[in-house]
Amino acid sequence: MSLWRRMFAFAGPAYLVSVGYMDPGNWATDLEGGARFGYQLLWVLVLSNLMAILLQTLSARLGIVSQRDLAQACRETYPRPVSYALWVLCEIAIAACDLAEVLGAAIALNLLFHIPLLTGVLLTAADTLLLLWFTRLGIRVIEAFVLSLIAIIAVCFAIEIFWAGSPILSDVARGVIPHLSSHNLYIAIGILGATVMPHNLYLHSALVQTRRIGKSAKEKLTACRFNLIDSTIALNGALLVNAAILVLAAMVFFKRGIVVTEIQQASHLLTPLLGTTFASIFFGVALLSSGQSSTLTGTMAGQIVMEGFLNIRMRPWLRRLMTRTIAIIPAALVVYAAGETGTYKLLLLSQVILSMQLPFAVIPLIHFTNNKQRMGKFVNRAWVQALAWSTAALIVVLNVWLAILSVRDWLNDAGGWRGRLELGLVPILTGLALLLLWVTFHPVLPLWLRKVARASVELGVDLPAAVAENLPSPIYRKILVPLDHTSRDRDAIAHAAAMAKQHGAKLYLLHVEEGVTSQLFGPLSSTAEVEAGDQYLHQIIRDLETQQIAVEMVVRHARTPTKEIVRYAEELNPDLVVMGAHGHKGLKDIVFGTTINAVRHKLKVPLLIVRGIK
């Protein structure tokens, strides 16, 4: 295979991740920074991009080498309360990111079609089902779609800057020199939070596992190198887009002394200042493209985080609807109460929230990639460790500084609510500080404390042991047994095996991989979960073959197990289908699905539902 074809095979994950670096939240912080401070904060963009390349590379390396995403590694390493706390913080970050996408899409619809902001916010719920339908076309189509949106954004801003004229290069050069004060700290940290997103670290470590990497050290090294190239190209492209937004704001607004307090204001001012009505149109198209591209990756990140931390697989449409609802409620309330100015402030706040979540993703990532037992020969070298810890230290210091300034401002503006605000902030800030200390110093805690606090959940799939040994004997030719890798498998196999012995039948064991990576990449998936499942099924086959039972294993990758079970049953035409019942009812049926109920309505062969063996 040629070098370019190999690079293309690994390309993709970083581009899906990079769209999060160009979402509407970036627009708010970049426009604010350029309009208020000119080119002064360009250095923050450059620094943030370098930090992003470093951290995303470490995230990709963790996934490639350990075959674990960041959420799974946290679940394995930390005690359950700490793991749950990290999950909650990550969900808050995803909701904050989605909030920016909701507001960005609503503003874009308002600019392009004059749809009221509140109506636009509510309309953004529709993209949930539309984009989830789009994922059915396959991962390469999704990647092409996202790249098309990125290209649209880049072209729109290139045209805007062409109309604005050439920037003064000496001013741009001075903007790359670091300079920070209490006046621009809030925006600087907002840019940092908008550029380096915590949930992208979880997403990248999972997406890289969807390529068939191989087991050898040489194959993993090749994958790491190609992913470094992929990340560098994709994230530098995002840097150019963000820099274009800030430079445009500096050229058009800062030099005229115009303070931008909302994105709509920036769009409306572009037409008279640049002398063409197309300026506002291109601005709106780019903003809409930005929000829609980020929506796709936000859904994927949410699924990966929930699966990794909690080992819970929620239906994709429900997961997307849940995240979007959490984002729509505050957006709708702010639009209703404060109008356009309120949406702009909420956009900035969402990016600061993202920045404050960063230490809780970055520090565990550094610990895991510094761990020789986990990473082997791919453990971080001394200079990488120094850069990584310097990055983490900078993030923590800036966020502590921001927290102090923010709390001071909140207390000064609280008036009669000051006492209640203090009462609420003290436990929250104390809890966050203790959590940060735990994840920072966990590897050097006393051994007795680490033993007490060991994670109670093993990494990957919790596979029951000895499913097919010493089976009870409860009564065709072809018997289909769908499995789900739980203790219910034993009950279904027991009944099916007893019938196979009596009738000389052959068992067909079907397992449908439905993880988020399996949904997107199908048979190309090579995650630790898939490999553990293969080992699990082969062990069952060996146990059954020792009992002289003919057996065949079938593994499919699909979004919904129900359709795949029915599809394979129609191909096989078995005499009997034996399934283990999960016992869900009510709310759990809505969240996790009702596989048996859906299958029994579509199958045209006998179905035996096994509830358990006493």
Report residues per predicted region:
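Extracellular/periplasmic helix-exit of transmembrane alpha-helices
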Residues: I53-V65, V208-K218, N236-Q265
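Small/aliphatic-rich secondary-structure junction motif
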Residues: A468-P523, T527, D543-E545, I549-E552
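Hydrophobic alpha-helical segments and their helix-loop junctions in multi-pass secondary transporters
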Residues: T128, I150-V176, L185-A206, P364-K372, ...
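Structural beta-alpha unit
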Residues: A455-N470, E545-V577, K614
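Flexible loop linkers connecting adjacent transmembrane helices
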Residues: T29-G34, T57-V82, I107, L137-R140, ...
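Loop-to-transmembrane helix boundary motifs in multi-pass membrane proteins
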Residues: R80-S83, L118-V121, I233, S280, ...
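Gly/Ser-rich helix-loop-strand patches that form or flank binding pockets
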Residues: S456-L459, A569-K614
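C-terminal membrane-solvent junction of multi-pass transporters and transport-like membrane proteins
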Residues: F145, W317-M322, L346-A403, V407-W410, ...
